[in-house]
A protein has these predicted regions:
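Structural preference for beta-rich elements and adjacent junctions enriched in aromatics
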Residues: 1-250
Length: 250
């Protein structure tokens, strides 16, 4: 009986906004030295099968709140160095929309992503998207939906085309975000998302519509232990970021 076999993953209901639920989950912590994930978008390392998969996405654009048509397997792994995020996006391969764009150029393309409120206080979120074709987007979002693209962090994200859809992976170093020091477990706010360009839909968990009163202050929560925030790294030019650099301490 596999965890998340229903596609839901183990979660606790926090509350609802406009009838849309938000949840708390627990994210497993590993030592960076035992993870050995190559960020290539394939999601083929054994360790991904050791953690729960989640699929609680609803249609947020247009704001119907309906269950997503296509299945998404969303997984999270925390280490002392950062957060690994993977998505397997099931859909008929002929419906995939793949274009390569410059960083932070938002066009009509399939993507998956995450928004993180690392302080858990609802003051600022960092958002990260990997597009099919490996373009990436990132920035900050202030309450409730004030998006800024003038922040670029040293992280890595990749996509991969499968016979049953596509998949993606990202590694997000804690050191590029303003992570407060906390004794013991911490709550990090998060929203998971996916764009299906072919149907002009955006899936999200929590699946609030864009007209909802709250977003940054009403994210899901992930309970994480073992996070070791380092001095924030100075932002390095994106062209020079490699997996190794993203994993470096300093």
């Amino acid at each position: 009986d596999m965890p998340g076999a229903l596609g839901q993953g183990t979660n606790t209901l926090i509350d609802q906004q406009d009838g849309i639920p938000r949840h708390q989950i627990s994210v497993r912590n590993f030592q960076e030295s035992e993870v050995n994930i190559k960020v290539d978008g394939k999601v083929d390392e054994d360790i991904w099968q050791q953690v729960e998969q989640y699929d609680n996405m609803l249609v947020a654009v247009p704001g119907t709140g309906a269950p997503a048509e296509y299945k998404t397997e969303y997984r999270l792994i925390a280490t002392e160095k950062g957060l690994y995020v993977s998505g397997i996006m099931y859909q008929p391969p002929e419906t995939l929309v793949k274009r390569r764009t410059a960083r932070d150029q938002s066009i009509d393309v399939d993507n998956f992503g995450i928004t993180l409120d690392v302080s858990g206080e609802g003051l600022v979120g960092y958002w990260f998207y990997v597009q099919l074709g490996d373009s990436v987007m990132d920035g900050k979002v202030l309450p409730e939906r004030n998006y800024k693209i003038d922040w670029d962090g040293p992280w890595v994200g990749k996509s991969f085309v499968r016979s049953d859809g596509w998949s993606g992976e990202m590694f997000l170093p804690w050191s590029m975000m303003n992570v407060p020091s906390v004794k013991g477990p911490r709550n990090i706010g998060f929203a998971a998302s996916r764009t299906v360009s072919n149907t002009a839909e955006r899936y999200q968990w929590p699946g609030y519509s864009y007209s909802s009163a709250r977003f940054v202050t009403a994210l899901n929560q992930m309970k994480v232990e073992g996070v070791e925030p380092k001095q924030q790294v100075s932002v390095i030019p994106f062209a020079s970021v490699t997996s190794d650099q993203a994993l470096e301490d300093d």
